[in-house]
């Protein structure tokens, strides 16, 4: 019998949630996703030292101002790691906009343009890039404009139906609804343990997937942030799943049979009228889990971006 990972690939496109090139080679995913935390982790891998030095040299060539050099080096390093990953995966790389721009539509658009330009200067077409943005109202509005320009986006830190609906209505290419972080919140809030079937994160992604398919939205649903393989197996059939190396290894070493759980709708009905900003903010605010986890996620990505910049500053100043 094929291992569980290979069985899963029959129903779902598998994406590696890592910046570790050796892990990506091992599990042969279609795409890969990165974020500031993963870039920070990858920057500590000795084999990546040349990518860091290249980013430092490039940043120094662009500006004499240290603050600008730090920003440029961070952007260039994220792209350098993306370029290495694109040598391995046949599909796309997701590269994230600075989390500190999560409430700045114009700043997010400008950063996306810069990242795309860096990839294009390295010979990579924008069709192989997904720009990752936090699923704030401003991030969704930025994505709507970028999509109209032909720049595809991956809306991340998505914890609520309101965020998912707004993304679909904006014509976003792909969303990353989080599973494990939703489970974390509910376990802490209720003190209960959940089976994979009852897992609140699994229930959330399933309802989003069903809504998209029932209303004919083309936005890709890519479940993310998993705590165990049970969650992954319950979402077999989801358009894509982005999975970290530890769980990819567990799936590869397992022969648990997989059954497709998520199925496309048999008929499509017209969606409701589009949400207004006021509706979005109210519906999102009504979900304390989503409010807390989005804010926490943005803060934590910003903290890791800051740690990365401390390292880059030391190298730029030496």
Swiss-Prot record:
Biological process according to GO: carbohydrate metabolic process; pentose-phosphate shunt
Q: Taking the first listed entry, what is the main subcellular location of this protein, grouped into a coarse class? A: cytoplasm
Pathway named in the protein's UniProt entry? Carbohydrate degradation; pentose phosphate pathway; D-glyceraldehyde 3-phosphate and beta-D-fructose 6-phosphate from D-ribose 5-phosphate and D-xylulose 5-phosphate (non-oxidative stage): step 2/3
- Tell me which Pfam families the record gives: TAL_FSA
GO molecular function annotation = transaldolase activity
Alphabetized PROSITE patterns for the sequence = TRANSALDOLASE_1, TRANSALDOLASE_2
Q: Which residues form the active site?
A: 132
Catalytic activity line of the entry: D-sedoheptulose 7-phosphate + D-glyceraldehyde 3-phosphate = D-erythrose 4-phosphate + beta-D-fructose 6-phosphate
Tell me where in or outside the cell this protein is found: Cytoplasm
The question of whether Transferase is a record keyword is answered with yes
EC numbers, comma separated: 2.2.1.2
Top EC group: transferase
* Functional note: Transaldolase is important for the balance of metabolites in the pentose-phosphate pathway.
Subunit description = Homodimer.
Q: Which family does it belong to?
A: Belongs to the transaldolase family. Type 1 subfamily.
What this protein is called in its record is Transaldolase
Q: Tell me the organism.
A: Shewanella pealeana (strain ATCC 700345 / ANG-SQ1)
């Amino acid at each position: 019998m094929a291992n569980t990972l290979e069985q899963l690939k029959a129903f779902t496109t598998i994406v590696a949630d890592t910046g570790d090139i050796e892990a990506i080679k091992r599990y042969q995913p279609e795409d890969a996703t990165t974020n500031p935390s993963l870039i920070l982790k990858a920057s500590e891998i000795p084999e990546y030292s040349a990518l860091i030095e290249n980013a430092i040299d490039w940043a120094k060539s662009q500006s004499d101002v240290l603050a600008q050099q730090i920003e440029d080096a961070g952007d260039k390093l994220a792209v350098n790691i993306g370029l290495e990953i694109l040598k391995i995966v046949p599909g796309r790389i997701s590269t994230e906009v600075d989390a500190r721009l999560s409430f700045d539509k114009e700043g997010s658009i400008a950063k996306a343009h810069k990242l795309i330009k860096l990839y294009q200067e390295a010979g990579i077409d924008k069709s192989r890039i997904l720009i990752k943005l936090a699923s704030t109202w401003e991030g969704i509005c930025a994505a709507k404009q970028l999509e109209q320009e032909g720049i595809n986006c991956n809306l991340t830190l998505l914890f609520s139906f309101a965020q998912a609906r707004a993304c679909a209505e904006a014509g976003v290419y792909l969303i990353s609804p989080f599973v494990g972080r939703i489970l974390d919140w509910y376990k802490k809030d209720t003190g209960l343990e959940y089976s994979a079937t009852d897992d609140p994160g699994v229930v959330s992604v399933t309802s989003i997937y069903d809504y998209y398919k029932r209303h004919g939205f083309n936005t890709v649903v890519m479940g993310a942030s998993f705590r165990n393989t049970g969650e992954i197996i319950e979402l077999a059939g989801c358009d894509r799943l982005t999975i970290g190396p530890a769980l990819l290894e567990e799936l590869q070493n397992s022969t648990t049979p997989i059954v497709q759980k998520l199925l496309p709708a048999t008929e499509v009905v017209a969606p409701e009228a589009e949400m207004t900003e006021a509706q979005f903010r109210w519906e999102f605010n009504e979900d304390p889990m989503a409010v807390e986890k989005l804010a926490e996620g943005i803060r934590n990505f910003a903290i890791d971006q800051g740690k990365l910049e401390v390292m880059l500053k030391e190298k730029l100043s030496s």
